[in-house]
C-alpha cells in the first residue's frame, strides 16, 4: 500500500519533516517515491504542500497518515478530493 506520511529531517532537537509518498513497508526515513512538501513545527507550524500532487496521489489510492490528514484538512486537500470523487454539493434553490 502507498502511504503519504512524514519523514524526519533536521538536527537533534530541531525536527523538520518532509511530507512524502512512500511504500508502507519502507522505514520512516527510507527511500520515498515523491516529496509533496514540508512541515517545520519550530517556525509556528510552517507548512508548504503541493496541493495538486497531493490530490492526485490520494485519488490514485494513497492513504495519508493521521498527522498528514490533519495537515491536508487545513489546506483543503481532503475537501477537494471529496468534491472530485462525489461532486460538489448543489445548493437548494427552492423558492
Swiss-Prot record:
SUPFAM superfamilies: Ribosomal protein S16. GO terms for cellular component: cytoplasm; small ribosomal subunit. It comes from the Bacteria. One of its GO terms (biological process) is translation. Keywords: Ribonucleoprotein, Ribosomal protein. Gene3D superfamilies: 3.30.1320.10. One of its GO terms (molecular function) is structural constituent of ribosome. It holds the Pfam family Ribosomal_S16. PANTHER family: 30S RIBOSOMAL PROTEIN S16 (PTHR12919), SMALL RIBOSOMAL SUBUNIT PROTEIN BS16M (PTHR12919:SF20). Belongs to the bacterial ribosomal protein bS16 family. This is Small ribosomal subunit protein bS16. The gene is rpsP.
Amino acid at each position: 500500500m502507498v502511504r503519504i506520511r512524514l519523514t524526519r529531517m533536521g538536527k537533534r532537537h530541531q525536527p523538520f519533516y518532509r511530507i512524502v509518498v512512500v511504500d508502507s513497508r519502507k522505514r520512516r526515513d527510507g527511500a520515498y517515491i515523491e516529496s509533496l512538501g514540508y512541515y517545520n513545527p519550530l517556525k509556528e507550524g510552517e507548512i508548504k504542500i503541493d496541493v495538486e500532487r497531493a490530490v492526485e496521489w490520494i485519488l490514485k489510492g494513497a492513504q495519508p497518515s493521521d498527522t498528514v490528514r490533519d495537515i491536508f484538512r487545513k489546506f483543503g486537500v481532503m475537501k477537494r478530493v471529496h468534491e472530485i470523487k462525489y461532486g460538489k454539493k448543489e445548493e437548494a434553490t427552492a423558492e
